Every structure is written in C-alpha cells, then in structure tokens.
C-alpha cells in the first residue's frame, strides 16, 4: 500500500505524491494512515468520517479478468452538487457520428491539417477542445471521437468529467498538470495520459499554453495487446505505466463542475473541490505512460512489417482479432532490413487511420506533416510515402542500417469509418493541396528491363 500526506492542490510546482507502477493492477493507496477500511469495502462507519463510494468502469458481472472498479473514500460523495444546466453556444464537440448525427458526408479523399492555432482569448483545456472526426456513438457506447485541444489558461475553479468515454490524451506542446479524484498526473510531450470515463479532473498549464490530441473511447476499455510469438516482454511493458497515489484537498468555495454527456456540455455549481478522495483501492484509475519507454520491434532481415508491431494500447471489439481502436506509435528506431523499401509502404486499408505528430518528422512524409498537425486516410483510401521520400528511399544503400531518430508520430486506427466533422472539413487548417504530394511519383515501368 502506498501512503502520502499531500493535502492541498498546488499547481505551481510538480506533484509530490508519486505513482504506483503497473497496468490495471489492484492498487491500494491512502493519504492518511488507516484511511482505507480493513478487510471490507463499505463499513458502517468509514475511517475519519469519510464516505465510501464505488466507481464502476464495467458491468458488475463482467468477467473477473475484465472487471474494472475502484472504491473511493472521500470527504463528500460525488452526488453533492447543484443540478446541471445545459451549456449553450457553439457545437464544437460531436458524439454521434451516425447518419442521424451532425456530420457531413465522408469524402474518400486523403485529408491533412495544419496544427490548431493557439487561442487569442484565455481558453482552458475544456474550452479548447474541438472534435475533428470519429465514429459510432457515445450514447451506444461504441466507437470514438477524436479531438484536438489548444489552451492557454489553467482550470482553477472548474472541474470536468466525460460520461461518454475514457480520454486518451496525447500532448504535443506544453506540459499538463492533471489533478484527478484519484491523484495527480504530471504529463509532458512524449507521454500520454488516460482518464477513465467519469473521473473528475482539472488541467493546469505550467508552461502557459498547451496543444495536443484526445481520443475519446466510447467502447471497451483500453488494454495492453497480447504479444503472441513476440513472447513475454516487448512493446509497452506493464511496469512502465504509472497510476497516481492518493492525494486530496479539503477546499470549499464557489466552483463549477462541467459534465460531458452524449456530446453536450452541462454545468453545475459545486461548493467544494471534488478532489477530496483521501484513500482508494481498485483497478479503475487514471494512468500515464512514457512513449520513450516503448520496446520497438522491427525486421532484422527484410521487409517492413505491418504497423501492428507498434501497438501500444487497444480497445477490443466483439470480433476476435479486430480491434475497435488501436493506438499505435512510430518512435525513434533503427532500420536494418536489406534490399527493402524501408519507409512505410504504399497502402490501402480496410481500417481507417487518423495520424498525429508529436515531434520531428514522420519518415513517410518529407514535408507538410508537422508537429501538431493531423492526417486522415479512411477505408481503402490510397496513401503512402510522398514522391521525395520514395525517390530517396529507393536509392539508399540498404547494406547499412540507418536510424530514424528525430520523430514521434502516432495513429488512432479504427475498424469503422472515421467521419470528419463540419469543422474539420471547413477549417482553414485543412490542406487543400495534400493530394499533390503523390502527383510527382514518376512512372518507372519498363517491360523490356526487369
């Protein structure tokens, strides 16, 4: 059991409560000695006058290996707040990507965007969200939404949670100090954070501004993939995932609680901080992971293997071997395959691919795809390296290995069509000339010369 004594939320400096190591472990942590009840979950009187509250992330009857829940011991139950009211205004968040939803027809074109501009007005993490694309429906608990965020103000008297799905946050610029009910995550670019569905949190920006990506998973919880013949180690190792120790604040005042439900934002007055969980135990909790710890697998003979070797996390579907969402990264790595076209090959995919770039250059695109930008190649849309990359990769000496060092790209790959929103198709950040990167590919065919 981990114990801490952090009792106030101070966003002006890094957190001090520390972390517990492992993925979806049965964690136990308390900020006051003896705050966790002994040998039971819901005693008649919890220690320190706390309330016992269960937070369920799966059905009660889910198989034990998939069942996710945590018991929280808090100063006030989560039910203590005023009624919610609908937040009116611009619909920048989308949660229904079916034909009845507010999305335009999905083009088969390859799409690419420049980074989302930093806001001109003070904007926090929640107000800085905009939905770019997605599939399925939050109401049906199936599919996902892909958002971008750009913010320049910390959340001080405001708290947020999404009832629609768990949030996979990929920072591209600026650190995020994320305080949650279950403890604090300090996250920087090259790291990711996952906030479970329903967990309340606030984000501070120690660098003054931040930008990045969010994949909101409506469906089955993210998990580590099976490794198959890779063996018992490799890819994202469980020990490198960090879940926060308990820390709490007992603070009263005039605050705002914002809820996201079915793609709409709702607000309620709340007279205390929801970060009042003094102790908790269970396996449903926020976590972070450093992408630089990924154990990259690749070919040491010939050919470029399928990108599934770069899989970090997956959300499984009801079809064995077919994931609803794959989170894949393209990290720094050595390329050693001989007589092989080493960049990612030309491809048409039954799945749909939304890509982002955290740092550097993606090895399949010489220019145009920049950090903070994004691209979308939907089902059966042809894509691959641009003309300049193809010419260079076709001429290099493959008897010598080379290192792709200055990069960190990622992909949200889904089994169903990723439908861009009206914002994504109308924004000035959409690169109208993206298709031109392939128009320079020359005809090399000569039937007289093999």
From Swiss-Prot:
Subunit structure: Hexamer; dimer of trimers.
Function description: Involved in the catabolism of homogentisate (2,5-dihydroxyphenylacetate or 2,5-OH-PhAc), a central intermediate in the degradation of phenylalanine and tyrosine. Catalyzes the oxidative ring cleavage of the aromatic ring of homogentisate to yield maleylacetoacetate.
Organism: Burkholderia thailandensis (strain ATCC 700388 / DSM 13276 / CCUG 48851 / CIP 106301 / E264)
Gene: hmgA
Binding-site list for Fe cation: 347, 353, 383
Family: Belongs to the homogentisate dioxygenase family.
Alphabetized Gene3D superfamilies for the sequence: Jelly Rolls
Lineage: Bacteria, Pseudomonadati, Pseudomonadota, Betaproteobacteria, Burkholderiales
Named cofactor requirement(s): Fe cation
Protein name in the entry: Homogentisate 1,2-dioxygenase
Pathway(s) annotated for this protein in UniProt: Amino-acid degradation; L-phenylalanine degradation; acetoacetate and fumarate from L-phenylalanine: step 4/6
